[in-house]
């Protein structure tokens, strides 16, 4: 089944956002379109932007005036950016970053008032959950590049990414309990990224943790000085982009598939995946290149 079909079935300013340089803006029909139901007026700027270069797509949360709140419009725009050409061999890795001093403050509380109604509230949370599932089930790795606060659903977004790199000035919180809205959906991703007692302390108190604490508990992959954030994130992205897309894609899918299984089932599934990997053109190319003491030439073909 095509990757997009599978995905759909699951129903810091300046250099920190990688928007400068020779990044190729995605087609206007993609970048400027308003996802169905997003509720954004045509005159309003798109809440995310996306550019792609050398197999690396950078998606930027672009509403710093509202602390990059994950409004319904923002979520649908982010979903569109993530799903765009997911099956293309030209796409090797995705980076999600943000403009301004806040990565994301979480849901837009103005959308969660009584006036909006239960159906609208359900759409907000269901759309957010779909975005997180799209990240998990996407055929390429997704990297969060964090410079600043990631709170509530913003913290959920970081926890949902495959890799997360943050500046040492960043912090992470699930503070919904302080305004009477427990961070139940952020808790799903958080509980799968950090130990249970750490997750529950964050959820029960709403108190933030530092980048170093987040690294210690497994929410982050790396913490670097702010000046080195883009360089280190791009180093990781370029390394992934230099590898075989189908091999990496199979590896990602297999990793998450085996994760909830018992030990025996996990080894059975991964053994089958290793056999499938060897049947890939790039699987044989890599081994042949190693034996011939040369660099592999990846085809990036799925068979």
Curated annotation (Swiss-Prot):
It is found in: Mitochondrion. This is Enoyl-CoA hydratase domain-containing protein 3, mitochondrial. May play a role in fatty acid biosynthesis and insulin sensitivity. The keyword Zinc-finger does not apply. InterPro entries: ClpP/crotonase-like_dom_sf, Enoyl-CoA_hydra/iso, Enoyl-CoA_hydra_C, Mitochondrial_ECH-domain. CDD domains: crotonase-like. GO terms for molecular function: enoyl-CoA hydratase activity; hydro-lyase activity. The keyword Mitochondrion applies. Belongs to the enoyl-CoA hydratase/isomerase family.
């Amino acid at each position: 089944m095509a990757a997009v079909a599978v995905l759909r079935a699951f129903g810091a300013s300046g250099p920190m956002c990688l928007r400068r340089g020779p990044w190729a803006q995605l087609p206007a029909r993609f970048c400027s379109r308003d996802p169905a139901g997003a509720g954004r007026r045509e005159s309003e700027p798109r809440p995310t932007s996306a550019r792609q270069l050398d197999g690396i797509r950078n998606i930027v949360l672009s509403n710093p005036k509202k602390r990059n709140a994950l409004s319904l419009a923002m979520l649908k725009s982010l979903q569109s950016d993530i799903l765009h050409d997911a099956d293309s061999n030209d796409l090797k890795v995705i980076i999600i970053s943000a403009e301004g001093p806040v990565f994301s403050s979480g849901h837009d509380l103005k959308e969660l008032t009584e006036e909006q109604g239960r159906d609208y509230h359900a759409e907000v949370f269901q759309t957010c959950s779909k975005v997180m599932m799209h990240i998990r089930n996407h055929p390429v790795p997704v990297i969060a590049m964090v410079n600043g606060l990631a709170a509530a659903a913003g913290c959920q977004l970081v926890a949902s990414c495959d890799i997360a790199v943050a500046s040492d000035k960043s912090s992470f919180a699930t503070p919904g309990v302080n305004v009477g809205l427990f961070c139940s959906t952020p808790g799903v991703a958080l509980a799968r990224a950090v130990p249970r007692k750490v997750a529950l302390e964050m959820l029960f108190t709403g108190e933030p943790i530092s980048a170093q604490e987040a690294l210690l508990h497994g929410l982050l992959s790396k913490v670097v000085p702010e000046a080195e954030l883009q360089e280190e994130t791009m180093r990781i992205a370029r390394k992934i982009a230099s590898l075989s897309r189908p091999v990496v894609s199979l590896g990602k899918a297999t990793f998450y598939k085996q994760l909830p299984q018992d030990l025996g089932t996990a080894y059975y599934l991964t053994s089958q995946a290793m056999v499938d990997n060897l049947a890939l053109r790039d699987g044989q190319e890599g081994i042949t290149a190693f034996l011939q003491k040369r660099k592999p030439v990846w085809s990036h073909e799925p068979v």
